[in-house]
Design a protein with these regions (language model features):
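Elongated, amphipathic alpha-helical interaction scaffolds
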Residues: 1-330
Length: 330
């Protein structure tokens, strides 16, 4: 058997956000958020699209969104690449999920708590040893929690999890092991298969149960991730080399440091642009010089946004619409 990689957005949504994934998501959230205690007995899987209430505010797409316990909202995101400003995007998505609960004129007491759960395939907090970390709003000096315990941020850093199959003890361990290793497995381990929800997750993740269009979409996304990882590595190396040369030409130590920093930034942006153009041409056809010029004029953040959006483009008209919308925001 071959299993799809639950770390890709397509697979993650299919496993945890499908109409028949309710029991899987309950087990997963209880394992990660509540140390496998059955705190969540029921939930409602919601549309992960956060439509803005105010014209001009950025649209948001989450991987999975659910109403748990009748009132609290959990937003879940799987992130493979450590992209620029990702930590700010988490804050933005959480506060937006909190604020869109109210309509104009409604009372603030109608607001319900939001938990933002983020699973990363990279280390976000190198100074922390724990695999799961939790953040909330506290007073800076005395660490007293804010009066309204409304926002919580939970992170699972997969690279920090190093338990083997034989070392798995808790349901939490088993779900994290599934997230980290499912793609490399060729059968369902007995240690995981004895959990009904995990066994069902493996069934959904079995490539044999996907139709050709789903397999093609999955392959495109995995190729994109690998290309982007390679482009970032290459761009960083080129940027460092350019920065060192620039600093040496300036002849000062400060110039070398500044040159390296600027070179890395410029190199990464150029590498991302090259990668995005290549991915676009795979999806929608050859781009004209005008399209390439428009893409080159985008900021680093806009390039990142385009890199996420292009996977859903079906034609050049989709790209045209996206560029027009984002050029109007500049």
């Amino acid at each position: 058997m071959n299993f799809i990689n639950p770390k890709t957005d397509f697979a993650f949504k299919k496993i945890f956000g499908s109409a028949d994934s309710k029991d899987i998501l309950i087990s997963f959230l209880n394992a990660i958020l509540y140390e496998a205690q059955p705190v969540i007995e029921d939930l409602e899987i919601l549309d992960p699209y956060l439509a803005p209430k105010i014209k001009g505010v950025k649209d948001t797409y989450l991987d999975v969104k659910a109403k748990i316990g009748g009132s609290k909202t959990a937003i879940v995101e799987m992130q493979v690449l450590n992209v620029e400003s990702f930590e700010k995007r988490i804050l933005y998505n959480a506060t937006k999920a909190y604020s869109v609960q109210l309509k104009s004129g409604e009372n603030y007491n109608l607001l319900n708590p939001v938990i933002a759960l983020t699973i990363t395939d990279f280390q976000m907090f190198e100074h922390l040893e724990t695999v799961i970390s939790r953040f909330c709003i506290k007073e800076k000096n005395n660490l007293v929690e804010y009066l309204a315990d409304e926002l919580e941020f939970v992170f699972v850093e997969l690279p920090k999890f190093d338990k083997t199959l034989a070392e798995l003890e808790t349901l939490t361990d088993k779900w994290i092991y599934f997230m980290k290793t499912a793609r490399t497995l060729r059968s369902v381990p007995e240690e995981l298969g004895n959990v009904p929800e995990l066994r069902k997750a493996f069934t959904i993740a079995n490539e044999a149960n996907l139709d050709p269009d789903e397999l093609e979409d999955l392959e495109r996304r995995e190729i994109f991730i690998q290309d982007q990882r390679g482009a970032i590595t290459k761009a960083t190396r080129i940027g460092i080399e350019q920065g060192i040369r620039q600093g040496i030409e300036q002849g000062i130590e400060q110039g070398i440091e500044q040159g390296i920093e600027q070179g890395i930034e410029q190199g990464i942006k150029q590498g991302n642009m090259t990668l995005i153009v290549r991915q676009l041409e795979r999806s929608v056809g050859v781009l004209s010089p005008e399209f390439k010029t428009s893409i080159a004029q985008l900021s680093a953040q806009q390039l990142e946004n385009l890199g996420e959006a292009l996977l859903d483009f079906a034609s050049l008209s989709d790209l045209t619409t996206w560029l027009q919308a984002h050029n109007n925001r500049q």
